[in-house]
């Protein structure tokens, strides 16, 4: 059994539990790529790009697949790799590992802040008198308790969360196909394939609108790399991880492109309200009375799922950082069930602070945090691709023996890095995201200072 190890106060060797099974990983690979970016953000993306949003999802999906293939090849090249920190330290050094580890932690902490705030907003749909902070707080407590139990319970939670999302999207696609086949007619006109090009063409807002849509499209894919982080806790990583990664293209075509294709065939893109979920609008058009409540429930569980994934991934990252002396040793303590309890409490406190900030100034903080988070994820993805390039160049013997290889290397690596740089340029074009490009460097400067201070103290101790 492979796992990160540490010693408890009694000097006994402990390891992270491998409690995740194949079905957990396969559905987590889907669930990690389905969230508020698709359920809510797709309305804004369609508003910018029109039907060409389908191409934006396809293009982004290709590069996300390349990122996942490079991540998978790295993780499977060395049984000692269990997270980003492990291979970044190996190829880029301790400082890069320190920055990467804490940045990935911050990525998911910021997402959890937004998701738990969203849980409160969605709950108010049914219970408008309930304070917005209360459902988020209760959700955090419940998720913390469940994550403290066992790794297997986390897997079960994500399995059912992801299953709800999958069923909702499949129901939309099947319903949409039936409506198109029967020529269903709404107030905006009949459901037809012609809706894709009869309202200004595939690129109704030109290349400018198409390019601006990538901001929200990339955000919709944030978290797709979580399947890689779980590599250290799968029962058979050599078999499970490649299968999960290789199925990503099919899932992107079905759950992203397929769902939006059906939506825009039923409703012309220019009729959809960008401030509402297109999923809710389509189900409402069908005449299902409880459609809004059904989708609201799905979106709520989606937010809870993202928060659950955040709590899991950040605790494992903090545990790994503590094991490598990049965080206080107290954070690497494991329970009798081999769960990093102190790391879970640490991440929960950080998320709780974010819930309070989102309550005090929800609109400003949400936009800023999600934009900064997106930039940080781009950093993580870029570092992964760079590490893969160095692995191929410096470990050629290991690379030849690795059966799970990055396709079209090294062209795919360089194209992916160029795409990520392109997304940063897009973020600079939009007024509501430009500020994130100025704020994010502060985070990296802070980490560099902390690393230097920690290293200096370490030398003094020695």
UniProtKB/Swiss-Prot annotation:
One of its GO terms (biological process) is transmembrane transport. It comes from the Bacteria. Keywords: Amino-acid transport, Cell membrane, Membrane, Transmembrane, Transmembrane helix, Transport. GO terms for cellular component: plasma membrane. Its main location: membrane. The keyword Transcription does not apply. It is a multi-pass membrane protein. The chain crosses the membrane at residues 27-47, 48-68, 96-116, 134-154, 160-180, 209-229, 252-272, 279-299, 343-363, 366-386, 410-430, 435-455. The keyword Membrane applies. It is found in: Cell membrane. Signal peptide: none annotated. Probable amino-acid or metabolite transport protein. PANTHER family: D-SERINE_D-ALANINE_GLYCINE TRANSPORTER, GABA PERMEASE. Belongs to the amino acid-polyamine-organocation (APC) superfamily. This is Amino-acid permease AapA. The lineage of its organism: Bacteria, Bacillati, Bacillota, Bacilli, Bacillales.
């Amino acid at each position: 059994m492979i796992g990160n190890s540490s010693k408890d106060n009694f000097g006994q060797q402990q390891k992270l539990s491998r409690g995740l099974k194949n079905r957990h990983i396969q559905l987590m690979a889907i669930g990690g790529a389905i969230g508020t970016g698709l359920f809510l953000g797709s309305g804004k993306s369609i508003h910018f790009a029109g039907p060409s949003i389908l191409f934006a999802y396809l293009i982004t999906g290709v590069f996300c697949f390349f990122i996942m293939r490079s991540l998978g090849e790295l993780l499977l090249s060395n049984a000692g790799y269990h997270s980003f920190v492990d291979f970044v330290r190996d190829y880029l050094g301790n400082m890069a590992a320190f920055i990467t580890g804490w940045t990935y932690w911050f990525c998911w902490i910021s997402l959890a802040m937004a998701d738990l705030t969203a849980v409160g907003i969605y709950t108010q749909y049914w219970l408008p008198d309930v304070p917005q902070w209360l459902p988020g707080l209760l959700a955090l407590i419940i998720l913390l308790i469940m994550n403290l139990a066992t790794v297997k319970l986390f897997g079960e939670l994500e399995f059912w969360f992801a299953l709800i999302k999958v069923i909702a999207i499949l129901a939309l696609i099947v319903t949409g196909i039936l409506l198109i086949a029967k020529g269903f007619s709404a107030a905006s006109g009949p459901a037809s394939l012609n809706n894709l090009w009869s309202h200004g063409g595939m690129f109704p807002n030109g290349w400018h609108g198409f390019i601006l849509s990538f901001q929200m499209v990339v955000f919709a894919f944030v978290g797709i790399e979580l399947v890689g982080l779980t590599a250290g806790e799968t029962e058979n990583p050599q078999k499970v991880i490649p299968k999960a990664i290789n199925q990503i293209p099919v899932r992107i075509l079905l759950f992203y492109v397929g769902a939006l294709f059906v939506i825009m065939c039923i409703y012309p893109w220019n009729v959809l309200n960008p401030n509402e979920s297109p999923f809710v609008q389509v189900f409402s058009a069908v005449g299902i009375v409880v459609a809004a409540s059904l989708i609201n429930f799905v979106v709520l569980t989606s937010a809870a799922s993202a928060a659950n994934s955040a709590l899991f991934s950040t605790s494992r990252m903090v545990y790994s950082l503590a094991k490598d002396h990049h965080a206080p040793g107290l954070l690497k303590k494991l329970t009798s069930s081999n769960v990093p309890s102190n790391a879970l409490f640490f991440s929960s406190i950080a998320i709780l602070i974010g819930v309070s900030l989102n309550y005090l100034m929800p609109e400003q903080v949400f936009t800023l945090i999600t934009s900064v988070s997106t930039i940080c994820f781009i950093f993580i993805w870029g570092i992964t691709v760079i590490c893969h390039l160095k692995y191929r160049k410096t470990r050629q013997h290991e690379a030849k023996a690795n059966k799970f290889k990055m396709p079209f290397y090294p062209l795919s690596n360089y194209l992916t890095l160029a795409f990520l740089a392109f997304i940063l340029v897009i973020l600079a074009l939009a007024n509501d995201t430009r500020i994130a490009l100025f704020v994010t460097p502060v985070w990296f400067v802070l980490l560099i200072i902390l690393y230097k201070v920690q290293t200096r103290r370490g030398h003094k101790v020695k």
